[in-house]
A protein has these predicted regions:
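Membrane-water interface segments that mark the loop-to-transmembrane alpha-helix transition
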Residues: 1-5, 32, 41-92, 107-110, ...
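Signature of the first transmembrane helix
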Residues: 1-49, 80-88, 115, 211-236, ...
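Helix-loop junctions and terminal segments of transmembrane helices
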Residues: 14, 44-60, 131, 249-291, ...
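Interfacial segments at transmembrane-helix termini and the short loops linking adjacent helices
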Residues: 91-112, 240, 306-336, 446-451
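Membrane-interface junctions at transmembrane-helix termini in multi-pass inner-membrane proteins
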Residues: 118-144, 333-364, 404-406
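Hydrophobic alpha-helical transmembrane segments
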Residues: 140-155, 160-190, 250, 363-368, ...
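Interhelical loop/hinge segments that connect adjacent transmembrane helices in multipass membrane
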Residues: 160, 164-170, 182-227, 270-285, ...
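Membrane-proximal transmembrane or re-entrant/amphipathic helices at the cytosolic face
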Residues: 433-498
Length: 498
């Protein structure tokens, strides 16, 4: 399901958006969506996290969970009202910041409010379904449904059925429809009551919830801002057109982290249980294993992207415009590798008795990112914004992992990451040799340049991938990977005999 959504998003972004939208319009849609995600994330007041924590205290099928789901709807509404008021109070400074280089965003800035509202309740009702162990349908709506509707919106705009105003309205309605579908599904379960029971909430529970919520709000102020700093700094300082070019580059780099979600989702419950049982030795082994496989997956995907980056941009409509951000792809991909490989350390900290330190490290990350963006964007443009992200995350993880290593005695690093890095560097050197001395002969064989590039890419990629897999296997980097290869070879051998 996740990969189906990625495929739809890939087609939409690379072949529809880049062909039919100007770079400024691409930047506009990115800033609108990111601003809406930020507002919705803050307005939730940490409900999605606190719902997971406190639902067991309310869970009672006979009493329809004592109105828990009513609280889960009311609290975000309060948060939305508060942050919408703040939005209007700071509207003028926000508009002044964007007006010089991103005036088009200022024209559509008020659409952030309805889009954020729909996004907020989309997540609220998905969380409610997850609490009832109903995960598939809400995830399908978010991962596939929204992307399909977004594709339809862009096609309507491409064929001039709707204008720019209509496209922005339709994008808002996309999230609205998804939210309504989640509500319908939740009610179809016939287990939900939104009638609040204030008398059921004990004094202790109320106090604990308030304190925990304040912690989540403080954390979310920083953590929700981080993913969107680049978008806001690039659009505000360099304009929506540059932000649009940067958006495509970031999307390409984000392919690196596709395996991260699945691996992280599988590992978190085990880390949580290990920390609860104080099995630090087992947690340390698990963390090293998770970090290694995240690193292997992300760096090999990055390798495949980077050796084919010129072909990728040549296939994208208007690729000669978007390839200005080629260096951004490189830097952001490295950021993604760092984040996917080392985020398991942050997971350990969040499940430990020192969880409150995560707020401190997140604040450090935010401040570093802001300072670096302000410093580097005037010097290097969108590449400066990418470097700001890289420096910020390196500082963040260096401090966080030192703390986790000293206080919790957990360390995600091993020599196997170093060996993997050496293998990938060797593959890059081999690819450089192939491109210098062999690719030109392949390209000369074809009159059509694109066909020649594709054939060359397929041959080089296949050859290098086989060398990479063989090297990982031969040096016994991962027992799990070796087991998969052995089973595959055994299957082929048996099949051949038959």
């Amino acid at each position: 399901m996740n990969y189906l959504g990625v495929l739809v998003g890939f087609i939409t972004t690379f072949f529809i958006v880049t062909k039919y939208l100007t770079t400024e319009e691409v930047g506009l849609t990115r800033v609108l969506v990111d601003a809406s995600i930020l507002l919705s994330g803050l307005a939730q007041l940490g409900t999605n996290t606190s719902a997971m924590r406190y639902y067991p205290y309310f869970k009672d099928e006979k009493e329809r969970d004592h109105g828990f789901f009513g609280w889960s709807v009311l609290i975000p509404l309060v948060g939305f009202v508060i942050f919408t008021i703040l939005f209007f109070l700071f509207r003028q400074p926000i508009e002044n910041y964007f007006s010089k280089n991103s005036a088009l965003f200022v024209d559509y800035i008020y659409f952030v409010i309805p889009m954020a509202f729909f996004m907020m309740y989309l997540m609220v009702f998905e969380t409610n379904s997850n609490l009832l162990l109903r995960i598939v349908i809400p995830k399908f709506i978010r991962e596939v449904g929204i992307r399909l509707m977004t594709l339809l919106v862009y096609l309507l705009y491409a064929f001039k059925v709707i204008g720019l105003d209509g496209m922005v309205v339709a994008l808002c309605l996309t999230y609205g429809i998804a939210t309504v579908l989640n509500i319908i599904y939740l009610f179809s379960l016939k287990k939900v009551s939104f009638r609040i029971q204030p008398a059921y909430v004990s004094k202790w529970l109320r106090k604990d919830f308030v304190l925990y919520t304040f912690f989540l709000i403080a954390t979310s102020l920083a953590s929700n801002l981080i993913p969107f700093l680049n978008t806001f700094f690039v659009s505000g300082k360099l304009g929506l057109a540059v932000a649009g070019i940067n958006t495509i580059a970031v999307y390409i780099a984000s392919i690196v982290e596709i395996p991260y979600r699945s691996l992280a989702a599988i590992s978190r419950p085990h880390i949580s249980q290990g920390m609860k049982d104080n099995n630090i030795g087992d947690v340390n082994k698990l963390v090293k294993n998770v970090s290694l496989h995240q690193f292997m997956a992300s760096i090999f995907i990055f390798f495949l992207i980077w050796i084919n980056i010129d072909l990728l941009y040549s296939l994208i409509p208007n690729g000669n415009v978007y390839d200005e951000a080629k260096l951004v792809v490189l830097i952001i991909a490295v950021v993604k590798i760092v984040n996917t490989s080392l985020n398991v350390g942050a997971t350990v900290l969040s499940y430990s008795k020192y969880y409150y330190y995560s707020l401190l490290f997140t604040i450090i990350l935010t401040i570093t990112a802001i300072v670096m963006n302000i410093t580097l964007i005037p010097m290097w443009g969108m590449e400066g914004a990418a470097m700001a992200s890289l420096i910020s995350y390196v500082v963040y993880y260096a401090l966080l992992l030192m703390f986790v290593n000293v206080r919790i005695k957990v360390n995600p690093f091993s020599l196997k990451e170093f060996y993997t890095l050496l293998i990938v560097i060797s593959l890059f050197l081999i690819d450089d040799f192939l491109q210098r001395y062999l690719s030109q002969y392949i390209l000369e064989m074809f009159d059509n340049k694109i066909i020649g590039q594709i054939i060359d890419s397929v041959l080089r990629t296949s050859f290098l991938l086989m060398i990479g897999i063989f090297s990982i296997y031969k040096f016994n980097i991962s027992k799990q990977v070796n087991d998969i290869i052995n089973k595959f070879v055994s299957f082929l051998t048996r099949h051949k005999k038959i």
